[in-house]
Amino acid sequence: MTKTIGSERKVIVVTGATGGVGRGIALACAEAGWSVWIAARREKEGEAVAAEVDALGGEGHFVACDVGVPGSAAEAIATILSQEGRLDGVVHNATSGLSPVPVSLAEVGLADFQDHVHVALGALHSLARASFEALKESRGSLLLMTSEAGFEGKAKLSPYAGVKGAQRGFARALAREWGRDGVRVNSIAPLASTPAMERAFELDPAMADRVLARNPLRRLGDATEDIGRAARFLLSDDASYVTGHTLMVDGGSCPAV
């Protein structure tokens, strides 16, 4: 019999899951009864999300992880494996704290640019290397949270758009490399109501009208119901034949993929 979401127990880890889309993914996976590890710097916030996972029928855990610190991702993966004995999915959602801040390239110093690269790509490199053997054993998957900015570009968000486009290329290349070992690699380009999006709207008040005007559904996605459940599908066995794909979960805002 073909397995479906809810009939399988998965062990997954989500970076940057103390709020926004990361939290939404954690809660959606909790709905399926999965074991969800919240990998984050802030223990109090991470434990709070883990408690929400428990309340929804999943198994919530916090593991200390600062993706910006070399070795931290590997330590987090090792901790999870020591307690669970397996790992089925890794979600890299963490992003630079500078991501929602619109700024012209002339004002972007090298340190700020490197911060984007370090969190979006350097941490991804570390997570992928640290988790590969476990994902190979479970025939699991790696899921990256990218952005429509990586497809079409965004004025005054060039560092963010640049690393998000690079993430997509990384995912497609890794899908080809890891496919022979049964490991899937996919991406999601979300558009959701999150604290980061709200901050961006505060910095650019006209942005909200622009975003909704180009959205056929005229709304922002819900971090759990829309983005989280799409992520859960890609992490599940129901998506066992899906790899190297970027799923646009943006209400049709960026149709030209």
For each predicted feature, which ranges?
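Amphipathic alpha-helical dimer-interface segment in Rossmann-like NAD(P)H-dependent oxidoreductases
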Residues: 78, 119-137, 175-176, 236
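Short C-terminal tail/terminal secondary-structure segment
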Residues: 2-4, 102, 152, 232, ...
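Short, small/polar-rich loop/turn modules that mediate ligand/substrate recognition or access, typified
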Residues: 179, 184, 242-244
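Catalytic loop of short-chain dehydrogenase/reductase
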Residues: 96-97, 110, 141-167, 171-180, ...
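Conserved glycine-rich cofactor-binding loop
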Residues: 18-20, 42
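Catalytic Tyr-X3-Lys loop
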Residues: 106-125, 143, 167
